[in-house]
Amino acid sequence: MARVLVIGDVHEPVSHPGYRQFCVDLAERWGTDRVVFIGDLLDFHAISFHPTEPDASGPIDEMDEAAIRVRAWCTSFPRATVTIGNHDERVYRLAASVNIPGRFIRSYASLWGTKGW
């Protein structure tokens, strides 16, 4: 029987500071052979359709910080399966709302530097 570590709602770059290490420790402790992220690896607070925190980082700073953290997750779990959550797809929804075709949007792996995801 497979041992699957399911990781949800990371919300980078604002995840709990110890969340990644906690997940790494769980994977090692239980000898997991598969890791699945079940959505919302990213937060994208700066481009939310909801009211945003005025003192929060802007979209470029948020993306730069998220990229560093997402690559760390990818280093920890290089063969993970990543599903797209509603926060992850905010860029696609925002682009569609102003008629930007999907082919102009970079792939997940290309954007975040997560080869294999």
What residue spans do the PLM features occupy?
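Core catalytic region of metal-dependent phosphoesterases/phosphodiesterases
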Residues: A2-R3, I7-G116
